[in-house]
């Protein structure tokens, strides 16, 4: 079922902090996107590109295994990963193996190990704590315990042509998109957007990055799976549509 999660804590080793407004959207079919803009960029480099990380993937790019009633493993092989796109040195390569435990509060504890210096080198452990939000609210509202969101709106659009690849996921009132230009490896080729539906049924942009943010879809009503949507010359395909 769809999910809209806010990260509360990011911990590497003994150091826990949170410098971002990180939201992760998961569609009803299991497609996913995570945008992690910085709250207070601390230097010129961060001010120029105020993003910790962003990635997106299809349901074919993740493997989920149930361990028990409260625990699953999720193995990610991201379709779009801006660290990989930017060729950032010393980053994990390949599948990322994670374990997710649901607490009594319904917060989700994600743990895992990455190997930025190579699979034969010492790994780096991490933990992220996630709070499920009510995606039908425009504010950060904690999802009530036991909330059934199986019928929430879940719409996914994809672009993958000769020049661009990207994913746009709408869960409830919240839309997030990530798109990269093929053949490049600089921040100039990265575009991302986060927006929320207002009382007038339009979408208010809360965060955006890139010169082609006007090429993201901005209307999500009455879309049928398999149809094409033209946005200022960019053709997006609806790959999921649940209302």
From Swiss-Prot:
Chief location: cytoplasm
Protein name: Protein HRI1
Claim: Nucleus is one of the keywords in the record: yes
Family: Belongs to the HRI1 family.
InterPro entries: Hri1, Hri1_N, Hri1_N_sf
GO cellular component terms, A-Z: endoplasmic reticulum membrane; nucleus
Keyword annotations of the record: Cytoplasm, Nucleus
Gene behind this protein: HRI1
Cited Pfam families: HRI1
Entry's localization field: Cytoplasm; Nucleus
Coiled coil stretches, renumbered: none
